[in-house]
């Protein structure tokens, strides 16, 4: 099938005001199979540490590696196992690893065998490496009520360390969990009564179960962004967002503004279902924020989703909008993480522009701002022509590739199934070479079909494949973000 597209358009100009560009990241999804509720932290020793829920719900595991991708094959160490009776003899859910004042702490939800009695619990580890540390139990976190509680996380704002967690609010009949916050006296004891900052009161938070859970915090641009997950743990599972000013009174529920729509949901096109229970980490170079989450690679589940073992850990780059807010985009397809291609050239039609997927017929209307997924592409290597070629596959429309129209400089998007001859595959294949205007930090894409011609932005702001005139190399040069 050929899309009704004559050109690939360019997204609206990128503003350097608040959204800072950072290099592309290179990971392969899924990162770790059968590991839900993932938590990855980069410690000051340069190592990445990983923990997550295992399908048996019977132990706490840790991994470490010097890269995020390295966690995939890193050996796993069991640092705590389910007990025979009492607290910790039931479910073992959603551990998180934190380093506080020279010691390691794991926040985890523990149950009691034969009872639906799940509470947030803390372990303390002494030692430089948490995989070999000496671990002791600090006990259940005592809150306002002795009710179902889980998913504790911690962060520091304005010199105060806070705990945020999910708990059943006894004043709200029929709801499973709300989000609460309190300052910490020490890593296992809250100070003063907690306050609720979010209840599952929106329709998308109440599908299957009425849930707000899995809080995670990232602080940027003078604001505190708190993500959480909602609804049942099947394909309806999704993520919401609370936002507060960094200088706000975080114990005042009015300081937290809830987004009225979910910010990260299932995507049929990319075949990613039930994304959620996220955390944040940073790339190896420290320049990009990384979204860590779980989902499944299929929609339909037989029986209770909690009995399905195939939630898996995934990672992708978190982008930032001009206004300083996070743009989560969509759960990207399996395989290499996609990139954005920012044009290097200066000028009104090109400065800071991104290549985008475009479906409107005509010559390429450049008005409006492209959705993030439409500006993301997987650099498929080897490309459709094989060898050292690469092909640019759309993230928002997987299986669709950038190709040169035969006998023309124009570019269109074509389904890979229609590229069924060597010549057609060559029209959608390029050789990645050092950037023509910046060979140190950028790339250019030379046509396999027409060597010496390059993917480029023409003077009208349209993407084309053509020869490059002296002084216009920047229009054929792209920064990968």
Swiss-Prot record:
InterPro entries: AbfB_ABD (IPR007934), AbfB_ABD_sf (IPR036195), Glyco_hydro_43 (IPR006710), Glyco_hydro_beta-prop_sf (IPR023296). It catalyses: Hydrolysis of terminal non-reducing alpha-L-arabinofuranoside residues in alpha-L-arabinosides. Activity is significantly inhibited by SDS and partially inhibited by Ag(+), Fe(3+) and beta-mercaptoethanol. Its EC number is 3.2.1.55. Optimum pH is 5.0. The gene is Abf43. It is an enzyme of class 3 (hydrolase). It comes from Humicola insolens (Soft-rot fungus). This is Alpha-L-arabinofuranosidase 43. Optimum temperature is 50 degrees Celsius. Alpha-L-arabinofuranosidase specific for the cleavage of alpha-1,3-linkage. Shows high activity against 4-nitrophenyl alpha-L-arabinofuranoside, debranched arabinan, and sugar beet arabinan. One of its GO terms (cellular component) is extracellular region. The record marks 151 as: Important for catalytic activity, responsible for pKa modulation of the active site Glu and correct orientation of both the proton donor and substrate. GO terms for molecular function: alpha-L-arabinofuranosidase activity. It holds the Pfam family Glyco_hydro_43. GO terms for biological process: L-arabinose metabolic process. Keywords: Glycoprotein, Glycosidase, Hydrolase, Secreted, Signal.
């Amino acid at each position: 099938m050929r899309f009704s597209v004559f050109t690939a358009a360019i997204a609206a100009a990128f503003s350097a005001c608040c959204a800072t560009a950072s290099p592309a990241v290179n990971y392969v999804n899924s990162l770790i199979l059968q590991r839900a509720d993932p938590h990855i932290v980069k410690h000051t020793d340069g190592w990445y540490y990983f923990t997550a829920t295992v399908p048996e719900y019977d132990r706490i595991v840790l991994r470490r590696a010097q890269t995020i991708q390295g966690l995939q094959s890193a050996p796993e160490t069991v640092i705590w196992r389910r007990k025979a009776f009492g607290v910790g003899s039931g479910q073992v859910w959603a551990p998180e690893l934190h380093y506080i004042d020279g010691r390691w702490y794991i926040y985890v939800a523990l149950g009691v065998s034969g009872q639906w009695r799940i509470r947030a619990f803390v372990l303390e580890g002494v030692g430089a490496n948490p995989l070999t540390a000496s671990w002791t139990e600090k006990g259940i976190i005592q809150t306002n009520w002795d009710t179902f509680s889980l998913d504790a996380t911690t962060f520091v704002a304005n010199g105060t360390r806070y705990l945020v967690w999910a708990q059943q609010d006894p004043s709200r009949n029929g709801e499973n969990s709300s989000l609460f916050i309190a300052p910490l006296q020490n890593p296992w004891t809250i100070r003063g009564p907690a306050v609720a900052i979010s209840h599952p009161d929106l329709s998308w938070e109440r599908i299957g179960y009425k849930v707000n859970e899995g809080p995670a915090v990232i602080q940027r641009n003078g604001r505190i962004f708190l993500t959480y997950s909602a609804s049942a743990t099947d394909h309806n599972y999704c993520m919401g967002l609370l936002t507060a000013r960094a200088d706000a009174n975080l114990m005042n529920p009015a300081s937290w503004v809830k987004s009225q729509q979910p910010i990260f949901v299932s995507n049929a096109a990319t075949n990613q279902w039930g994304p959620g229970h996220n955390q944040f980490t940073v790339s190896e170079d420290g320049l990009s924020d990384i979204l860590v989450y779980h989902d499944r690679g299929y929609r339909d589940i037989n029986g209770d989703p909690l009995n399905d073992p195939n939630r898996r850990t995934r990672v992708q780059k978190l982008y930032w909008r001009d206004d300083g807010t996070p743009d989560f985009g969509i759960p990207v397809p399996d395989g290499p993480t996609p990139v954005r291609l920012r044009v290097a050239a200066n000028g009104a039609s090109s400065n800071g522009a991104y290549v985008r997927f475009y479906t409107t017929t005509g010559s390429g209307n450049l008005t409006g701002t492209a959705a993030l997924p439409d500006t993301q592409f997987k650099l498929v290597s080897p490309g459709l022509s094989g060898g050292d070629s690469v092909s640019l596959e759309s993230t928002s429309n997987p299986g669709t590739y950038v190709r040169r129209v035969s006998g023309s400089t124009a570019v269109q998007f074509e389904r890979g199934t229609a590229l069924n001859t060597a010549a057609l595959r060559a029209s959608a294949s390029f050789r990645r070479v050092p950037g023509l205007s910046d060979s140190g930090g950028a790339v250019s894409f030379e046509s396999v079909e027409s060597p010496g011609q390059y993917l480029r932005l023409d003077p009208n702001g349209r993407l084309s494949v053509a020869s490059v005139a002296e002084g216009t190399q920047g229009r054929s040069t792209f920064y990968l973000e």
